[in-house]
Amino acid sequence: MQNLTFCGVGAHRQNGVSEQIIKDFTLSSRNLVFHAQRHWPEYITTMFWPFALVEAADRMNNLHVDMHGQTPEMKISKNIGSSTRLSHFHTFGCPVYILDARLQSVGGGGPPKWHPRDRLGIYLGHSPSHAGSVALVMNPKTGLVSPQFHLVFNDCSYG
């Protein structure tokens, strides 16, 4: 028979392993938000912390490799031969150019010849409900965050 013991209210120092993981996620997401704020101070606020936390967890689960060459995701799924597509990882808060919706539809006419064929967005991580190549993008004009597919990322040249 196993006995369960509970810690008291406010006694959060009972499990050092889980506290270290929470600290790592918090610091990583904090860094992601601050980095994005430096480049988009008028759009990125601390309200985007949940997006950064999910992105930090996704990176730790898919990119941290132990001495046996396995990521946490490989250990849980017991899938040793899988490989992470590094092309799906981008800088949190980087500029994203989204293809005009009129060009995405089949048989639709495009925008007039001298109008832009894309719009600017801000990358906030992978969409949890779609394929790995679908990103969550914030529209700076409206503030709407939506999943987007036809994208070009500008990872290195902003700032």
Summary of predicted features, one role per range:
Residues 1-143, 149, 155-156:
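HHCC-type zinc-binding knuckle of retroelement integrases
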